[in-house]
């Protein structure tokens, strides 16, 4: 569907693990607009926090280019996610509006009651008054990347296959099969999650989320299509998403903070309670 934050996240992950060829060669997605922008914007930045994970990074020209592309798309992703959270308070992710918690002059960020020094303090595309606003060039690059994703025949064929054959859960041969977790409270009761202004739990939660995902592809109402696209991002990262099931996704912390205790992602109570027979009986 070309959901902007999902597109940015996909590219970032490929760069993080040194798998950009999956997009370029596997799906025919042109990374030149991002590469050009990264060189123009971060050409003098060593981007040390953005070296690919695994393998040896000797700092050759190709690796330096990918580091800069990595930082460029990461900053775009953080902006897009910050805006999504701000515009959708029912996601319950206000504490993840981290771009608004950064002191850009001193190079620190306040998370909870603690203030941490940033490992990378250079943010040339951040508007201090509107930190989650894309620059004109960032928006232009993102539009080109989204166009490439939407027009990749192989990618669209794979997504069509998932929509035709896949589902969030299925009853098969007397067994209930489902992705991820069933969001629970600490006492083992099913957690109520707000979606589109109403509260859902258990099977009803899976049903409404799958309904919204499919709306992203088939609805003729632009607003509903947009809501559906945003649901795809919600499923990927939100604490109340059955597919994620952790209190937060610490992408920002892992790039910018040295304190590893900030990297912790606490799993939903489901993962502790599912081993108990009384939980299954509910």
Model-derived features: positions:
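Feature recognizes metal-dependent phosphohydrolase scaffolds
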Residues: 1-282
């Amino acid at each position: 569907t070309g959901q902007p934050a999902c597109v940015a996240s996909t590219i970032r992950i490929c760069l993080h693990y040194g798998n950009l060829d999956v997009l370029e060669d596997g799906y025919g997605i042109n990374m030149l607009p991002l590469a050009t922008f990264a060189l123009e914007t971060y050409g003098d930045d060593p981007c040390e926090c953005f070296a690919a994970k695994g393998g040896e990074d000797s700092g050759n020209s190709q690796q330096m280019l990918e580091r800069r592309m990595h930082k460029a798309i990461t900053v775009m992703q953080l902006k897009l996610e910050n805006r999504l959270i701000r515009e959708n308070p029912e996601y319950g992710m206000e504490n993840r509006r981290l771009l608004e918690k950064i002191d850009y002059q001193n190079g620190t960020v306040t998370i909870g009651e603690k203030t941490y020094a940033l490992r990378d303090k250079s943010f040339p595309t951040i508007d201090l008054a509107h930190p989650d606003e894309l620059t004109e060039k960032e928006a232009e690059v993102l539009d080109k990347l989204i166009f490439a994703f939407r027009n990749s025949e192989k990618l669209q064929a794979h997504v069509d296959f998932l929509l035709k054959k896949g589902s969030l859960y299925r009853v098969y041969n007397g067994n209930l099969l489902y992705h991820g977790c069933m969001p629970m409270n600490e006492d083992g009761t099913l957690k109520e999650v707000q979606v589109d202004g109403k509260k859902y739990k258990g099977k009803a939660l899976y049903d409404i989320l799958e309904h919204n995902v499919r709306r992203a592809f088939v609805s003729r109402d632009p607003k509903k299509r947009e809501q559906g696209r945003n649901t795809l991002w919600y499923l990927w990262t939100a604490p109340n998403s059955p597919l994620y099931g952790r209190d937060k996704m610490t992408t920002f912390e892992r790039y910018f903070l040295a304190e590893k205790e900030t990297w912790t992602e606490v799993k939903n109570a489901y993962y502790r309670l599912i081993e108990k027979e009384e939980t299954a009986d509910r």
